[in-house]
């Protein structure tokens, strides 16, 4: 690859290592490199004008590449998924540590267009936001992370469209893609994904489930059919199955139920109240584990690791502008999210004693700066015109 201020040897090396250069044209690789360089830049906002600052092409060329470009994004997605599998499953085989598969969804909020808008954003709609506690307009992304021994990578991100598939079906389809876990592993999710269909799909791949439960789910204490919320009203701190458990810096009174519930033949269900809010309305939470051998403490500690996906969403939005795009086509949005996943993967793949996204982001920012300074230095040695150089870095 020729030495250019619009290119990065470090990023090109990463693209070659996962064999992406074998699947895409040189032009497509250059556009992807432009997008990745921009994503790693300080002040990046997710706008197409940001990309044009790191490209010899006009911003409309990058927009066309995302929205209508003739390149095989499915091949990129397949290569990235395989790279994530190799990294996470390889770490599990090397260390014996469990694989955690974590799923959740997030909303990329957008402004609702006028009814007279000629070109509204495709596939945008209203979705319930747990953060805002109300309906929010925009795109909903369903994400699956794979984690092992502190390494956290996004396996897939899917643009949710209720007209084509439910979120439950999306997760089941993703579970079907996974190889069987090489060690005992867990699937972690919130109450929206705790269905028998999903749990069975992951169990077939070697993943037990640890998840939140809605309090209207039905259990059968002593063979009596009751909703969790109704049953919990009769609990007392002095009951034999109620104990005080510490999770992180918080304490909870926890009742442990073992038996069947609707959709599951055998599981542990934990009914939890904060220590200072026992029996207060709205404070009950419930958790499930399909592995009945786990202790109450182990189940709650394991579920707390689901927080990794919340951290992931926050970093993608704050550092990679995951929700700030100005793209109207659904194809362009899916491609933008795919390249965001690629940027995150490369950051987490930088060799380090404790690999992390933030450490990788700092690495690429420093490398890109060094490469540009080097380019300008050697251009000066070859008597490059100063005005031309200033135009490049303007």
Each PLM stretch: what is its role?
Residues 1-74:
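Gly/serine-rich nucleotide phosphate-binding loop at the start of the catalytic core
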Residues 35, 282-306:
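Extended, non-catalytic structural segments that build the interaction scaffolds
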Residues 68-149, 250-258:
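Active-site-proximal, Lys/Arg-enriched surface segment
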């Amino acid at each position: 690859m020729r030495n250019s201020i619009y290119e990065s040897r470090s990023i090109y090396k990463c693209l070659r290592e996962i064999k992406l250069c074998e699947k895409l044209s040189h032009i497509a690789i250059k556009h992807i490199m432009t997008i990745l360089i921009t994503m790693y830049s300080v002040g990046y906002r997710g706008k197409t004008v940001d990309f044009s600052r790191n490209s010899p092409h006009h911003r409309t060329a990058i927009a066309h590449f995302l929205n209508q470009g003739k390149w095989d994004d499915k091949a990129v997605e397949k290569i990235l998924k395989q790279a994530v599998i190799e990294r996470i499953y390889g770490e599990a085989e090397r260390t014996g540590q469990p694989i955690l598969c974590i799923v959740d969804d997030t909303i990329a909020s957008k402004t609702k267009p006028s009814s007279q808008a000629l070109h509204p954003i495709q596939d945008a709609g209203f979705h319930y936001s747990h953060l805002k506690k109300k309906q929010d307009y925009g795109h909903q992304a369903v994400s699956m992370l794979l984690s092992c021994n502190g390494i956290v990578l996004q396996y897939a991100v899917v643009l949710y469209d209720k007209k084509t598939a439910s979120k439950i079906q999306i997760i089941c389809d993703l579970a079907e893609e996974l190889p069987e876990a090489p060690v005992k592993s867990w699937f972690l999710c919130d109450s929206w994904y705790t269905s028998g269909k999903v749990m069975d799909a992951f169990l077939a791949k070697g993943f037990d489930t640890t998840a939140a439960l809605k309090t209207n789910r039905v259990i059968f204490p002593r063979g009596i059919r009751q909703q969790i919320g109704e049953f919990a009203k009769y609990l007392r701190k002095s009951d034999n199955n109620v104990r005080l458990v510490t999770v992180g810096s918080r304490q909870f009174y926890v009742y442990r139920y073992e038996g069947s519930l609707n959709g599951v033949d055998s599981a542990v269900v934990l009914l939890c109240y904060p220590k200072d809010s026992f029996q207060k309305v709205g404070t009950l939470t419930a958790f499930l584990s399909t592995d009945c051998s786990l202790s109450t403490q182990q189940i709650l500690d394991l579920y707390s690791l689901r927080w990794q996906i919340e951290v992931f969403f926050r970093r993608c939005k704050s550092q990679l502008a995951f929700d700030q795009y100005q793209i109207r086509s659904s194809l362009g949005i899916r491609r933008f999210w795919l390249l965001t996943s690629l940027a995150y993967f490369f950051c987490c793949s930088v060799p380090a004693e404790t690999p992390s996204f933030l450490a990788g982001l700092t690495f690429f920012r420093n490398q890109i700066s060094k490469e540009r300074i080097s380019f300008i230095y050697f251009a000066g040695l070859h008597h490059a015109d100063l005005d031309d150089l200033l135009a490049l870095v303007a």
